[in-house]
Design a protein with these regions (language model features):
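C-terminal beta-signal and adjacent terminal beta-strands/loops
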Residues: 1, 88, 97-122, 137-143, ...
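Flexible, active-site-adjacent loop/turn segments at secondary-structure boundaries
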Residues: 2-5, 22, 69, 134, ...
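Short sequence motifs at beta-strands and strand-loop junctions characteristic
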Residues: 24-29, 37, 69-74, 132-141, ...
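Context-gated lysine
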Residues: 5, 26, 40-41, 55-59, ...
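Gram-negative outer-membrane beta-barrel transporters
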Residues: 3, 12-105
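Generic recognition of flexible, low-complexity loop/linker segments
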Residues: 33, 79, 133, 148, ...
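Solvent-exposed loop segments that connect transmembrane elements
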Residues: 6-20, 57-65, 109-128, 176-190
Length: 209
């Protein structure tokens, strides 16, 4: 792929528009997908696997070395199963897995010159070198639900009960950095993560007529 766009390492929107900070590079994307399904009486199974790789290369970024962009997900797996105990009662399971994406971590910290915060404390600034230099942990979770159907004449009532992220795996939705001072008085930027979707049970009613 040619003529790919990205922001330069020294991009600034203070004195110029966004398009003035764009640089041009090249890259490639390739992948493979496998999709399998199985059905036998009351059991339905589906398996999907995607293997992909994406690289980008810009003369002005990472000293011209190729890098993985933040949307590069190497492995992606989806396993879906449905078990029908009867025409009214069923169990559904969905397990998903995706490789961690790349993000940019600081390599150090600098002290802002003659600038303090509201409490007159010095302001610390993270120092970055290479872009997309850290791979986040892999993401995976299991969702499950039970469905029960109550048909009555023209009315169909379905009750669903289940949970997202059954085993409560901590999948980081985003990462931020918090300055912390150790016993020696040195300050480091410690990476912290936020989890948006922990274990969440639910129950729902669906009425059709």
């Amino acid at each position: 792929m040619q003529h790919l766009k990205d922001f330069s390492a020294n991009a600034s929107t203070r004195y110029s528009g966004l398009t003035d900070n764009m640089i041009e590079g090249k890259g490639y994307a390739r992948g493979f997908e496998l999709d399998l399904s199985f059905q036998q009486r009351n059991l339905h199974l589906r398996f999907n696997y995607t293997l992909s790789e994406s690289k980008r290369k810009f003369k002005e970024i990472n000293n011209g070395q190729a890098f993985n962009p933040p949307y590069d997900v190497k492995h992606n797996i989806v396993i879906n199963s449905s078990l029908y105990f009867s025409s009214r009662f069923s169990l559904n399971l969905l397990w998903t897995f995706s490789s961690g994406v790349y993000t940019t971590f600081p390599v150090g910290v600098a002290l802002a010159h003659n600038i303090t915060d509201s409490e007159n404390k010095p302001i610390l600034i993270p120092v970055y070198t290479d872009r997309y230099n850290y791979k986040l942990p892999d993401n995976h979770r299991l969702d499950a639900n039970l469905d029960y159907l109550f048909p009555y004449k023209r009315i169909r009532l379905k009750i669903s009960a289940g949970a997202y992220n059954v085993y409560n795996h901590s999948n980081p939705s985003f990462v931020y950095f918090n300055p912390e001072e150790n016993e020696n008085g040195k300050t480091k930027f410690i990476p912290k993560s936020k989890v948006i979707l922990p274990f969440i049970p639910y129950i729902s009613l669906h009425l059709n007529w």
